[in-house]
Amino acid sequence: MSVVSNTSLEHALREGANALGLDLSEAQITQLLDFLALLQKWNKVYNLTAVRDPQEMLTHHLLDSLAAVPPLRRHVARRGQGGAIHLGARLLDVGSGGGLPGVVFAICCPEVDVSCVDTVAKKAAFIQQAAGTLGLSNLHGIHARVETLAGPFDVVSCRAFAALADFTAWSRQALAPHGVWLAMKGKHPHDEIAALPADVSVFHVEQLTVPGLQAERCILWLRPVA
């Protein structure tokens, strides 16, 4: 990648972060750009994403994932004040693929310990490699089916992974007693919400605006109902 394209990507990342109200350190900006470079470098080998263009990767993957960081930070801060989530909170990102949004969460929320699980070994290996390359001691790649993980995790997240009913059913045993699910979706999934079992509740829906992306995005927060 040329110096010009590097500069262009950095400018777009900084503008996008500002538009999202994200206060990122210089180290975090560098880590995000280095992660983007890793995605580009290993994509052909690991088949991490169908997106090949660096600018499109930035918009559709990096900024799309960054849009979920402010809601996650607010949740961690709120629960931390209540004593349920604290420094070292654990997050499980399900079906993480190339590490989206899990790696982005690990970079932007260093107080959160992030585990990215995927059934494809080479994708989990890529995340583990990214953790080492980026110096992220709070990031772990796990090759497993989510149903086999015991947790407990304070937050279980996914992005374009599965229907809500499947996502919550498969990952429920990994959720801590006070834990919540964070599901990143496109359009508001009315049908998926209607199909949820009675013991799963959607307690908050947030509409997201992704800089440079003309598409609907939202986050759903869910929790088990006793």
Swiss-Prot record:
Enzyme Commission number(s): 2.1.1.170
Catalytic activity: guanosine(527) in 16S rRNA + S-adenosyl-L-methionine = N(7)-methylguanosine(527) in 16S rRNA + S-adenosyl-L-homocysteine
SUPFAM superfamilies: S-adenosyl-L-methionine-dependent methyltransferases
Binding of S-adenosyl-L-methionine, residues: 95, 100, 146-147, 159
GO MF annotations in UniProt: rRNA (guanine-N7-)-methyltransferase activity
UniProt subcellular location: Cytoplasm
Pfam families listed in its UniProt record: GidB
CDD domains associated with the record: AdoMet_MTases
Keyword line: Cytoplasm, Methyltransferase, rRNA processing, S-adenosyl-L-methionine, Transferase
InterPro entries: rRNA_ssu_MeTfrase_G, SAM-dependent_MTases_sf
Gene Ontology CC terms: cytosol
Family: Belongs to the methyltransferase superfamily. RNA methyltransferase RsmG family.
PANTHER family in alphabetical order: S-ADENOSYL-L-METHIONINE-DEPENDENT METHYLTRANSFERASES SUPERFAMILY PROTEIN
UniProt function note: Specifically methylates the N7 position of guanine in position 527 of 16S rRNA.
Protein name, entry field: Ribosomal RNA small subunit methyltransferase G
Gene designation: rsmG
